């Protein structure tokens, strides 16, 4: 009944991944991002991650696998997803939704820390404000974006972009693969 739809969905996902994989710049950006994050941890820094909707879940997943574990047991790494409901509701109510991430970065971000901003469109105003706040603090910035990078294009030290112009879920599927690879590479870098 739905077999053709299932095949089409899986084929489109495979094609999106294949297109991303063809561009060596993506491979180099992932490697550079992992080294940047590990270097920050080694120097006593931390990573803050943020995004909206599914990207918010990815930001939380990224932090959880760093503080918890990925595939093997090892020490936890300093990672915080900006996801505290009381913070988000307070700042959203008192200042506005566009400030929910930047206020947190202003409060706890330090020079030498890293911000991971995730947006499939690259146009999330609250992530863009978080990037500006991170810059004010002297933090490094890594972004996971999609399509043409949107307004976030060119704002990061390292941008990892999935140039897919269809639905956001295809971009998110690549983002989670990138997140898992970043964690794997960070773990390798941390034991060097």
Swiss-Prot record:
Residues 37-192 form the SIS domain. SUPFAM superfamilies: SIS domain. Changing residue 61 to Q: Almost no effect. One of its GO terms (molecular function) is carbohydrate derivative binding. GO terms for biological process: D-glycero-D-manno-heptose 7-phosphate biosynthetic process; lipopolysaccharide core region biosynthetic process; protein homotetramerization. CDD domains: SIS_GmhA. Binds 1 zinc ion per subunit. The keyword Magnesium does not apply. Zn(2+) binds at residues 61, 65, 172, 180. One of its GO terms (cellular component) is cytosol. It catalyses: 2 D-sedoheptulose 7-phosphate = D-glycero-alpha-D-manno-heptose 7-phosphate + D-glycero-beta-D-manno-heptose 7-phosphate. It is found in: Cytoplasm. InterPro entries: GmhA/DiaA, Phosphoheptose_Isoase, SIS_dom, SIS_dom_sf, SIS_GmhA/DiaA_subfam. Its main location: cytoplasm. Its cofactor is Zn(2+). It is an enzyme of class 5 (isomerase). The reaction produces a racemic mixture of D-glycero-alpha-D-manno-heptose 7-phosphate and D-glycero-beta-D-manno-heptose 7-phosphate. Belongs to the SIS family. GmhA subfamily. This is Phosphoheptose isomerase.
């Amino acid at each position: 009944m739905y077999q053709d739809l299932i095949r089409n969905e899986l084929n489109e996902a495979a094609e999106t991944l294949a297109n991303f994989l063809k561009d060596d710049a993506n491979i180099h950006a992932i490697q550079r991002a992992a080294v940047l994050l590990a270097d920050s941890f080694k120097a006593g820094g931390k990573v803050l991650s943020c995004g909206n909707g599914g990207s918010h879940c990815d930001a939380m997943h990224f932090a959880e696998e760093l503080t918890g574990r990925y595939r093997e047991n090892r020490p936890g790494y300093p990672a915080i997803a900006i996801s505290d409901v009381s913070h988000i509701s307070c700042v959203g109510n008192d200042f506005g939704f566009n400030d929910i991430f930047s206020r947190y970065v202003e409060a706890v971000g330090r020079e030498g820390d890293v911000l991971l901003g995730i947006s499939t469109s690259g146009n999330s105003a609250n992530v863009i404000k978080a990037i500006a706040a991170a810059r004010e603090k002297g933090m490094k910035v890594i972004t996971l974006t999609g399509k043409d990078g949107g307004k976030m294009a060119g704002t990061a030290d390292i941008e990892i972009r999935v140039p897919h112009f269809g639905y956001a879920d295809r971009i998110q599927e690549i983002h989670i693969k990138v997140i898992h690879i970043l964690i794997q590479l960070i773990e390798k870098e941390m034991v060097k």
